[in-house]
């Protein structure tokens, strides 16, 4: 015992010291020490507690609290380590007998953060968590693929649309090039024919001179049915041909005026 109360039973007279049962070859009992880091005042010291030893020398101590306290119990958890050469002196206050016992292990525990509850309450909480958690996780799993990820078929459809758009654009460009080539060839042929007619008129002095004041028809060339891109190309070519014919007619009129003055 420690403190003044224990020292009161230890006087200077000699006493008989007995070795306890823990010193026998096959001890029938064992003694342990328990060290708490913090023991709240709500623990009822008059009641017995519960000590459990699990795997890996893990120890759980459950002590009841004073009636009316919340929670009803306090839980401590820790571990135990064996003693090598440690003993404890036990003094009988009634007879004054002293008995020495060998210590088996030292248990060091700490109070859990959430004040402990009974085993029944722990099981109920676990069951409630199992009932609530699975539906939430299943809903998340069901909704996440449809909202966040695209299906492979939709990706293939998008790629196919892009390829078709590129192919149609290439076709329009090729048709525009072919139409421009044909129209350039038709305009060059019309220019050659007009130049030949002018040479014939100049070579025949007695014959009457004929002047074509009409504009060459652009529609003499082959007709094409084109798209919007081809229509734009045709308009550009028509404007250039009209400008050339206007310049040619002005040149002819100026030549005729000079001949009349002579």
Swiss-Prot record:
Region Necessary for interaction with ELL, as annotated, extends over 17-104
- What is the species listed in this Swiss-Prot or TrEMBL entry? Rattus norvegicus
Compartments where found: Nucleus speckle
Q: Write down the PANTHER family for this protein, in alphabetical order.
A: ELL-ASSOCIATED FACTOR 2 (PTHR15970:SF7), ELL-ASSOCIATED FACTOR EAF (PTHR15970)
Which ranges are annotated Low complexity under compositional bias?
174-192
Asked if the keyword Phosphoprotein belongs to this entry, the reply reads yes
Protein name per Swiss-Prot or TrEMBL: ELL-associated factor 2
- Record field: compositional bias (Polar residues): 124-144
Q: List, alphabetically, the InterPro entries matched.
A: EAF_fam, Tscrpt_elong_fac_Eaf_N
What is the superkingdom listed in this entry's lineage?
Eukaryota
Report keywords, A-Z. Answer: Activator, Apoptosis, Nucleus, Phosphoprotein, Transcription, Transcription regulation
């Amino acid at each position: 015992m420690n403190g003044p109360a224990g020292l009161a039973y230890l006087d200077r007279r000699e006493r008989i010291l007995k070795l306890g049962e823990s010193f026998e070859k096959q001890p029938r009992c064992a003694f342990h020490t328990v060290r708490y880091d913090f023991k709240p005042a709500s623990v009822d010291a008059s009641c017995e507690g519960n000590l459990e030893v699990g795997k890996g020398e893990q120890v759980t101590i459950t002590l009841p609290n004073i009636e009316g306290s919340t929670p009803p119990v306090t839980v401590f958890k820790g571990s135990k380590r064996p003693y090598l050469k440690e003993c404890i002196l036990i003094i009988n206050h009634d007879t004054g007998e002293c008995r020495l016992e060998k210590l088996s292990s030292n248990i060091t525990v700490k109070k859990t953060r959430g004040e402990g509850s009974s085993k029944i309450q722990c099981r109920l909480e676990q069951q409630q968590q199992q009932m609530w958690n699975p539906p939430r996780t299943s809903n998340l799993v069901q909704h996440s693929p449809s909202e966040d990820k695209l299906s492979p078929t939709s990706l293939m459809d998008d790629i196919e649309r892009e390829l078709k758009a590129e192919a149609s654009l290439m076709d329009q460009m090729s048709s525009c090039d072919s139409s421009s080539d044909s129209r350039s060839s038709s305009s060059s042929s019309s220019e050659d024919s007009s130049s030949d007619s002018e040479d014939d008129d100049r070579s025949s002095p007695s014959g009457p001179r004929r002047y074509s004041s009409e504009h060459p028809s652009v529609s003499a060339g082959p007709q094409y049915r084109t798209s919007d891109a081809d229509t734009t190309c045709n308009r550009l070519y028509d404007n250039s041909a009209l400008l050339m014919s206007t310049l040619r007619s002005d040149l002819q009129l100026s030549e005729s005026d000079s001949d009349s003055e002579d």
